[in-house]
């Protein structure tokens, strides 16, 4: 903590400091559609899949669902995000003084924002093992699959829109004497 002196920092009543995340960002559901080819590097940790039906094939999946039969981390990292998306996380405010700090009646907003995803459709690859067919996100890394199916027509599975919330920021108030 700072040593106390006679200085004063006053944020007037009615003042508003707002570093909250954006709440009016809307994206298409297709933003969650992944369609990427997998190679040896994505299958390096999957010995049963390395030379199987997934190798050099395009996998279609919902980015919100984990995939166990390939390492698709790099695909997630490749999603392009604009400034509005990055601005959904709340900001940080630090008010530091060595004397007194007064923020009585002021409003400081560090809340997190949200992204609203519209209704849409997503395609998911299917895998066949014997007479059983599973979606890619249900596939187990310990199973060797006989065939991969990708949708080449149609819209895919309908998915209801949703809201995704983001982290709030922080408020740091440090003073010899604080009135909040």
List each model region and its residues.
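Extracellular and secretory-pathway beta-repeat/beta-biased strand scaffolds
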Residues: 1-180
């Amino acid at each position: 903590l700072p040593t106390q002196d006679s200085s004063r920092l006053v944020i007037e009543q009615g003042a508003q400091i707002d570093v909250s995340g954006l709440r009016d960002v809307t994206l298409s559901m297709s933003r969650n559609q992944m369609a990427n080819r997998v190679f040896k590097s994505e299958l390096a940790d999957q010995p049963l899949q390395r030379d199987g039906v997934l190798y050099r094939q395009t996998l279609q999946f919902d980015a919100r669902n984990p995939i166990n039969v390939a390492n698709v981390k790099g695909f997630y990292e490749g999603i392009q995000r604009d400034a509005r998306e990055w601005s959904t996380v709340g900001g940080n405010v630090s008010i530091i003084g060595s004397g007194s700090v007064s923020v009585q009646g002021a409003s400081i907003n560090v809340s997190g924002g949200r992204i609203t995803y519209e209704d849409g459709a997503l395609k998911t690859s299917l895998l066949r093992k014997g007479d059983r067919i599973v979606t890619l996100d249900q596939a187990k890394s310990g199973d060797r699959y006989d065939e991969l199916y990708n949708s080449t027509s149609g819209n895919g599975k309908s998915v209801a829109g949703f809201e995704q919330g983001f982290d709030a920021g922080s408020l740091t108030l440090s003073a010899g004497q604080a009135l909040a």
